[in-house]
Amino acid sequence: MKIGLLEDNPAILDYMTTALQMAGYSVEAHTTSASLLDSLLTGEDLADPLPYDVVIVDLLLPGNMPGLAAIEHIHQLISPKRLPIIIISACSQVELEQVKEKLPDVPVLRKPFKMNTLLQLIEKMKPS
């Protein structure tokens, strides 16, 4: 199973990449929304096949496109059923509740979370 991981904090990115690889997943790490979105496209067309089975996105990202905007952009390109997304974030509980209202079908994990919790979510999203 291939995972696209968007996280701007190098320490968290390294930890999560290593943990996911040790769990048997192939991981492509991205530090910007632009990098992740570019990986989903071939030129101006959607990559076929998609490079990932699941995408994990941090909400709090520097630059012009925060995580929520990246997720909305991905959903414009690809059905959420075709490319599931998991949100990770250190936002406040109130902010995360607002995100859950906006994206009710996207699971949200508040940092810090247990890696086992993330692994269980990924397992639920495995393609059949």
Where are these regions (language model features)?
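Acidic, metal-coordinating helix/loop segments flanking the phosphotransfer/catalytic sites
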Residues: 29-54
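Short amphipathic alpha-helix used as the core "switch/output" element in two-component signaling
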Residues: 66-81
